[in-house]
């Protein structure tokens, strides 16, 4: 391949300008600055899209720290923005842990059926968290955000999250097949509990609705016009190794990936004037940047700087987010 190939634009401008995108996942190894990158991307998207939602699926929930604002399981407007919202979900949570807001607008029978459904779901391992995820996706789709950015947990959890629509499809299909067998018993069970309005058909309808939404999401996740994944790494061996594993797994899952962010880079203007540790780190980073250039010549590779101060608060993120659009250039130090 390649000596004649023009390197691709080293920014995320290609994503921000792709109007058809509905779902953008941002992920990588722990400690590489995923949350700063996903929050910055969401801020840039908010400039050109009608409404943007950033969802943290990392149990550490760093987006509250990044924006210096407490977020919950329900979309909340980010301070300083009119069209940027954030929420935090636990991908391992069960259906009963979802807040009641998720069931607003449902009739009383369906709200009560949440508990009955939980009893049925307990019989199928792994379906509980899948159903919780299904409810979240239903809520998100129902709110019609222009684009949703996922700030994901470290790599292993991320791959599970992306595979979840398929797990849910299988699980809900199983539940619906069980329906005919359990319907008489279920009707008897709910009438004993005094829930006359709840019946097997009500639950079945709820499951059918969920299955339809999840099937739709599953199709969208595999459509590169609607879904893409941004890998975040640092210029070190283990991070690069993890990134390559992630790219291969995503390709296997049929998820589009063509953007890599290399974060926390030293931009030395004169390595001779730098301390020995900085000069040494700079050399190591240059070595891995060369490897990244060889491995990912058909990717957009965005390089972000290691800063003296942490990126925290909406204004700080707004300022840092410009580096996603325009390649970072260090400011020249004034001569003494």
From Swiss-Prot:
ATP binds at residues 29-36, 236, 263. InterPro entries: Anion-transp_ATPase-like_dom (IPR025723), ATPase_ArsA/GET3 (IPR016300), ATPase_ArsA/GET3_euk (IPR027542), P-loop_NTPase (IPR027417). Its EC number is 3.6.-.-. Keywords: ATP-binding, Cytoplasm, Endoplasmic reticulum, Hydrolase, Metal-binding, Nucleotide-binding, Transport, Zinc. It holds the Pfam family ArsA_ATPase. One of its GO terms (molecular function) is ATP binding. GO terms for biological process: tail-anchored membrane protein insertion into ER membrane. It is found in: Cytoplasm; Endoplasmic reticulum. The keyword Transferase does not apply. The keyword Metal-binding applies. Zn(2+) binds at residues 275, 278. Gene3D superfamilies: P-loop containing nucleotide triphosphate hydrolases (3.40.50.300). The active site is at residue 58. ATPase required for the post-translational delivery of tail-anchored (TA) proteins to the endoplasmic reticulum. Recognizes and selectively binds the transmembrane domain of TA proteins in the cytosol. This complex then targets to the endoplasmic reticulum by membrane-bound receptors, where the tail-anchored protein is released for insertion. This process is regulated by ATP binding and hydrolysis. ATP binding drives the homodimer towards the closed dimer state, facilitating recognition of newly synthesized TA membrane proteins. ATP hydrolysis is required for insertion. Belongs to the arsA ATPase family. Homodimer. This is ATPase ASNA1 homolog. It comes from Drosophila ananassae. The lineage of its organism: Eukaryota, Metazoa, Ecdysozoa, Arthropoda, Hexapoda.
């Amino acid at each position: 391949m390649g000596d004649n190939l023009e390197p691709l634009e080293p920014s995320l401008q290609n994503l921000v300008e792709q109007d058809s995108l509905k779902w953008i996942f941002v992920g990588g190894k722990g400690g590489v600055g995923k949350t700063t990158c996903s929050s910055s991307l969401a801020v840039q998207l908010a400039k050109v899209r009608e409404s943007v939602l950033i969802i943290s699926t990392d149990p550490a929930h760093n987006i509250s720290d990044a924006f210096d604002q407490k977020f919950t399981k329900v979309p909340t407007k980010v301070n300083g923005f009119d069209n940027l919202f954030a929420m935090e979900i636990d991908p391992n949570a069960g259906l009963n842990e979802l807040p009641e807001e998720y069931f607003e607008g449902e009739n009383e029978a369906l709200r009560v059926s949440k508990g009955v459904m939980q009893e049925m779901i307990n019989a199928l391992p792994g379906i509980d968290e899948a159903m919780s995820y299904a409810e979240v996706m239903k809520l998100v789709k129902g709110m019609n955000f222009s684009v949703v950015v996922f700030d994901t947990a470290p790599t292993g959890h991320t791959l599970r999250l992306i595979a979840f629509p398929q797990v849910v499809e299988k699980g809900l299909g199983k539940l619906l097949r069980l329906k005919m067998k359990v319907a008489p018993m279920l009707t008897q069970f709910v009438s004993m509990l005094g829930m006359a309005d709840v019946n097997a058909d009500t639950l079945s309808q709820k499951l059918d609705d969920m299955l339809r939404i999840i099937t739709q999401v599953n199709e969208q996740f595999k459509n590169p016009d609607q879904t893409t994944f941004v890998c975040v790494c640092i210029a070190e061996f283990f991070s690069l190794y993890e990134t390559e594993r992630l790219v291969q797994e995503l390709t296997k899952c049929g998820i589009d990936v063509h953007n890599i962010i290399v974060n926390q880079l030293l931009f030395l203007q004169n390595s001779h004037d730098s301390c020995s540790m900085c000069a040494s780190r700079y050399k190591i980073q240059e070595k891995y940047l060369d490897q990244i250039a060889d491995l990912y010549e058909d990717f957009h590779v965005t390089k972000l700087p290691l800063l003296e101060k942490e990126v925290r608060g909406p204004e700080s993120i707004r300022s840092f987010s410009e580096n996603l659009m325009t390649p970072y250039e260090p400011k020249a130090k004034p001569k003494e």
